[in-house]
Amino acid sequence: MKAICVLSGGLDSAVTSMFAKSKNYDISTVTFNYGQMALNQEIKSAKKISDILNADHHVIDINFVKEFSKSGLNTGNIPEPENEDLDDFEKSEKTMKAVWVPARNMIMFSIASGFAEGIGAEKIFSGLNKEEGVTFPDNTPEFIERFNKSLEYGTLNKVKMVAPLYELNKPEIAKLGKELELKLDLEVLKYSYSCYKDNGKDYLHCGTCESCMRRKRAFKEAGITDPTKYLVE
C-alpha cells in the first residue's frame, strides 16, 4: 500500500509519518516551499526524518504564495504570546490570524492529492489535530470531510486524506510519538522542527513563538523528556 505523508518536519507531521510507517504503508513524503522563514530548517528536518523512515522525500515549490501572503511566516513578523495565552481563545485566534497563510492547506493538500493519484497511492496522511483545530478552520474534521468529498470528483482513484491525530492535543501527540519511536525502534522526535523561525543552527528552536511554546508544553504535560534545543528555555 502506498501513501503520501505531508511532512513539514514539525512534531505533528513527524508523528503522523511514523504512524503511517507503523501501519506498513510504503510512504513518500512531501514538503512545501511557500516562502516561509523556516524553510531551510523544515527541509533539513523533513529530509532527515524521511531518511530514518526509509521514505522518498520531495520538496514542492509553491513559492508564489508569498506574493499575496501577509503571514508572519512569510514576513518574519512572528507573534510571541505568553504561556497563559495558549488557552485563551481570543488571543490564540489573534495569533492564528497573524500566521495564517491564505488557503495554504487547501493548496498543499490538493497538490499532494495529485501526487498520490499519480503514483497510485490510496491515502494522504496529514498532521491535522484537535489542538490546532480550535483556531485553524483548515485543521478541523469538517475540513477533512469536505476536502475528501471534493476528491471524489477531483481524482479518478478516489484518493482520501486521513488525519490520525485529529482527536489528539499536543501532549497526546508527543506521547504517541514516543510510543511509535519505541515500536519502530527509531529516533525521530529529536529531529523534528516546529519553530516558525530559522535560528541559524539545525534543529535549534527559538522557544518563544507560539509553535515552540506549544511544543514545550506538549512534552512537559506528556511527562516525556523534551529532546529539543531552545534559544529560550
UniProtKB/Swiss-Prot annotation:
Binding site for Zn(2+): C195, C206, C209, C212
Note accompanying the cofactor annotation: Binds 1 zinc ion per subunit.
Catalytic activity: 7-carboxy-7-deazaguanine + NH4(+) + ATP = 7-cyano-7-deazaguanine + ADP + phosphate + H2O + H(+)
InterPro entries, sorted: QueC, Rossmann-like_a/b/a_fold
Residues reported to bind ATP: L7, S8, G9, G10, L11, D12, S13, A14, V15, T16, S17
Function: Catalyzes the ATP-dependent conversion of 7-carboxy-7-deazaguanine (CDG) to 7-cyano-7-deazaguanine (preQ(0)).
NCBIfam families given in the database record: 7-cyano-7-deazaguanine synthase QueC
Protein name as it appears in the record: 7-cyano-7-deazaguanine synthase
